[in-house]
C-alpha cells in the first residue's frame, strides 16, 4: 500500500467522528433513513442528527454547525471532546427512554435538549479555576429561561433591583453606617442614647421641670392663686347668668331651675310627696326636653355636686333618680336623652360604691361575689333586696343612657316592673337599716368607726399636717 493511500485512509478514519447523516427526504416513525449523503461537507451535521432525539426541524436548524463562523475550536478540539458529546447524547437518550409511557413527549424532548446543549456549552467555554463547584454548575448548566426569569422576578419583587448573591436586609447598610452593629461601653452608650431619642433608655428620675408650668405673670404665688380663684368665680357667675331655662314665674320648678354661684344655696331641693311629683313631674320633663343645650350644662354642674356628696346625701340622690324612673314607668313616658337626672345616674352610683365598698367587703369578704362583678353584669335576676335594687337599676340607667341610641323607655331599664310597686324612700331606709345591722354584728372596731364617720361626716381625726411653702392659708 502506498503512502498516499495510507494517509488518505487515516484521514477518512479521523474524520468519521465529524460525519453527519442528513436525510434527503422524509423519514417514517422508526426514523429510518431513505436517502443519505456522505459528502465531506455534510459530515459534521450527520453525526448530530444520528444521535439527537426526535424533535422538530425548526430546532435542528437553529443549532450552529462547526463549519459556521460562530463555531469555536478547531478539528483537534472537536476530536478531543467528541467522546464527551457522545456520552452526553447517549445518557440523554437513555434518560428519555426510561420515562413513563404516559409522560408528555415534549418533556422528554426538553430534558434531552438541555443535556446536549449543556455539554456543548461546556465544550466551547470552560472556566479556569474561578468560583466553587456550585457556581461552576450554575454557570455551565443554567436553568431553563422561563424558570430563571421567574426567579429573577420573584427576587426583584421582594428585594428590589439588588442582584447580589446574598440578599441582605434593606436597612443593613444604614445600620452599618450608624454603627448599630458595634458593642459600646457604658459611657459611650450613654452619650449615644442622649443623641438618639428612639434608643434612649428609661430614666426613673424625671426632672421636676417637666411638670412645672411656665408662669405668665411675675406675681407672688399667693396673688397668682387668688387671681386664678377669682377668675373661676367670675366665670361661674357669668355661666349662672347665661344658663337659664327661661321659665316663667308661674312654673312650680322655677326655684330649682335657676343657676346660682352661691355656695350656701340648698342642694337637696324642696321636699315633696309622690302625689305632687306625679302631678308636676311632666312639666319638669318638658322643660328638659325643650331646652337641650341648657340641660347638658345642668348635667355637668349636677355631676360635680353629686360626686362630692356625703353618704346620706348620696342616698337622697339615688332616691331622686329612682323616683324619677318610677314617674316615667307609671305615666309611660319616653326618656329624654339629655335629661340631667338620668344623665348623672353614673355619678350617684360611683359615689355609693365608694362609700359602701369597705362595708360590703367586711361583711361578705370572699364568700360572695364582689360588687364590681355584680354591677358588671347588672342582671335583673340579681335583685334580691333594696341594696341590690338601687345599685343595679342605677347601673342599668347609666348603660342605657350612654350606649343605647334611639327612643328609650323605662321597661328597657326595669324589665321586671319593680318600679310600679316601688315606694319612694324605700331604698334609703332599707340601706341605712342594712348598715346599722352590720354595725351591731361586726366586731371590728375599725369598721365601726368608719361607719360612724360615714353616716355623720364630722371631722374627728385623719389629717396630720398641711405642707405648703408657697403661700399661707
Swiss-Prot record:
<dbReference type="GO" id="GO:0003723">
    <property type="term" value="F:RNA binding"/>
</dbReference>
<dbReference type="Pfam" id="PF05459">
    <property type="entry name" value="Herpes_UL69"/>
</dbReference>
<keyword id="KW-0479">Metal-binding</keyword>
<feature type="region of interest" description="Disordered">
    <location>
        <begin position="123"/>
        <end position="143"/>
    </location>
</feature>
<feature type="binding site">
    <location>
        <position position="362"/>
    </location>
    <ligand>
        <name>Zn(2+)</name>
    </ligand>
</feature>
<dbReference type="GO" id="GO:0006355">
    <property type="term" value="P:regulation of DNA-templated transcription"/>
</dbReference>
<feature type="binding site">
    <location>
        <position position="447"/>
    </location>
    <ligand>
        <name>Zn(2+)</name>
    </ligand>
</feature>
<protein>
    <recommendedName>
        <fullName>mRNA export factor ICP27 homolog</fullName>
    </recommendedName>
</protein>
<dbReference type="GO" id="GO:0042025">
    <property type="term" value="C:host cell nucleus"/>
</dbReference>
<feature type="zinc finger region" description="CHC2-type">
    <location>
        <begin position="362"/>
        <end position="447"/>
    </location>
</feature>
<keyword id="KW-1048">Host nucleus</keyword>
<comment type="subunit">
    <text>Associates in a complex with RNA, and host export factors NXF1/TAP and ALYREF; these interactions allow nuclear export of viral transcripts.</text>
</comment>
<comment type="function">
    <text>Multifunctional regulator of the expression of viral genes that mediates nuclear export of viral intronless mRNAs. This immediate early (EI) protein promotes the nuclear export of viral intronless mRNAs by interacting with mRNAs and host NXF1/TAP.</text>
</comment>
<dbReference type="InterPro" id="IPR008648">
    <property type="entry name" value="ICP27-like"/>
</dbReference>
<comment type="similarity">
    <text>Belongs to the HHV-1 ICP27 protein family.</text>
</comment>
<feature type="binding site">
    <location>
        <position position="442"/>
    </location>
    <ligand>
        <name>Zn(2+)</name>
    </ligand>
</feature>
<keyword id="KW-1035">Host cytoplasm</keyword>
<keyword id="KW-0694">RNA-binding</keyword>
<keyword id="KW-0945">Host-virus interaction</keyword>
<keyword id="KW-0862">Zinc</keyword>
<keyword id="KW-0244">Early protein</keyword>
<keyword id="KW-0863">Zinc-finger</keyword>
<feature type="region of interest" description="Disordered">
    <location>
        <begin position="57"/>
        <end position="81"/>
    </location>
</feature>
<dbReference type="GO" id="GO:0008270">
    <property type="term" value="F:zinc ion binding"/>
</dbReference>
<dbReference type="GO" id="GO:0030430">
    <property type="term" value="C:host cell cytoplasm"/>
</dbReference>
<feature type="binding site">
    <location>
        <position position="438"/>
    </location>
    <ligand>
        <name>Zn(2+)</name>
    </ligand>
</feature>
Amino acid at each position: 500500500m502506498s503512502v498516499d493511500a495510507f494517509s488518505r485512509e487515516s484521514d477518512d478514519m479521523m474524520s468519521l467522528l465529524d460525519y453527519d447523516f442528513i436525510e434527503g427526504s422524509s423519514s417514517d416513525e422508526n426514523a429510518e433513513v431513505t436517502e443519505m449523503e456522505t459528502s465531506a461537507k455534510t459530515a459534521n451535521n450527520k453525526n448530530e442528527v444520528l444521535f439527537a432525539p426526535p424533535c422538530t426541524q425548526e430546532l435542528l436548524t437553529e443549532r450552529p454547525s462547526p463549519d459556521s463562523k460562530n463555531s469555536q475550536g478547531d478539528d483537534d478540539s472537536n476530536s478531543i471532546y467528541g467522546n464527551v458529546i457522545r456520552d452526553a447524547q447517549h445518557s440523554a437518550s437513555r434518560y428519555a427512554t426510561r420515562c413513563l409511557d404516559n409522560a408528555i413527549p415534549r418533556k422528554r424532548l426538553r430534558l434531552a435538549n438541555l443535556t446536549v446543549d449543556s455539554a456543548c456549552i461546556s465544550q466551547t467555554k470552560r472556566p479556569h479555576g474561578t468560583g466553587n463547584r456550585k457556581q461552576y454548575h450554575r454557570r455551565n448548566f443554567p436553568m431553563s429561561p422561563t424558570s430563571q426569569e421567574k426567579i429573577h422576578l420573584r427576587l426583584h419583587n421582594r428585594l428590589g433591583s439588588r442582584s447580589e448573591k446574598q440578599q441582605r436586609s434593606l436597612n443593613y447598610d444604614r445600620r452599618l453606617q450608624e454603627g448599630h452593629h458595634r458593642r459600646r461601653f457604658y459611657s459611650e452608650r450613654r452619650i449615644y442614647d442622649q443623641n438618639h431619642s428612639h434608643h434612649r433608655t428609661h430614666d426613673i428620675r424625671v426632672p421636676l421641670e417637666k411638670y412645672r408650668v411656665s408662669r405668665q405673670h411675675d406675681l407672688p404665688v399667693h396673688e397668682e392663686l387668688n387671681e386664678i380663684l377669682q377668675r373661676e368665680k367670675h366665670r361661674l357667675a357669668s355661666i349662672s347668668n347665661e344658663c337659664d331655662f327661661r321659665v316663667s314665674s308661674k312654673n312650680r320648678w322655677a326655684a330649682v331651675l335657676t343657676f346660682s354661684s352661691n355656695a350656701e344655696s340648698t342642694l337637696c331641693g324642696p321636699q315633696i310627696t309622690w302625689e305632687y311629683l306625679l302631678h308636676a313631674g311632666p312639666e319638669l320633663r318638658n322643660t328638659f326636653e325643650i331646652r337641650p343645650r341648657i340641660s347638658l350644662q345642668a348635667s355637668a354642674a349636677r355631676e360635680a355636686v353629686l360626686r362630692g356628696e356625703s353618704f346620706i346625701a348620696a342616698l337622697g340622690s339615688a332616691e331622686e333618680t329612682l323616683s324619677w324612673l318610677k314617674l316615667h314607668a307609671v305615666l309611660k313616658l319616653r326618656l329624654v336623652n339629655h335629661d340631667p337626672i338620668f344623665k348623672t345616674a353614673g355619678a350617684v352610683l360611683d359615689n355609693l360604691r365608694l362609700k359602701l365598698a369597705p362595708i360590703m367587703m367586711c361583711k361578705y369578704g370572699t364568700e360572695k361575689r364582689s360588687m364590681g362583678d355584680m354591677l358588671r353584669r347588672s342582671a335583673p335576676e340579681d335583685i334580691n333586696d333594696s341594696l341590690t335594687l338601687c345599685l343595679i337599676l342605677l347601673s342599668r340607667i347609666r348603660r342605657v343612657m350612654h350606649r343605647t341610641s334611639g327612643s328609650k323607655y323605662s321597661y328597657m331599664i326595669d324589665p321586671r316592673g319593680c318600679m310600679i310597686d316601688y315606694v319612694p324612700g324605700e331604698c334609703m331606709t332599707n340601706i341605712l337599716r342594712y348598715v346599722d345591722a352590720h354595725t351591731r354584728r361586726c366586731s371590728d372596731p375599725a369598721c365601726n368607726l368608719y361607719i360612724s364617720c360615714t353616716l355623720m361626716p364630722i371631722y374627728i381625726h385623719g389629717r396630720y399636717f398641711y405642707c405648703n411653702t408657697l403661700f399661707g392659708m
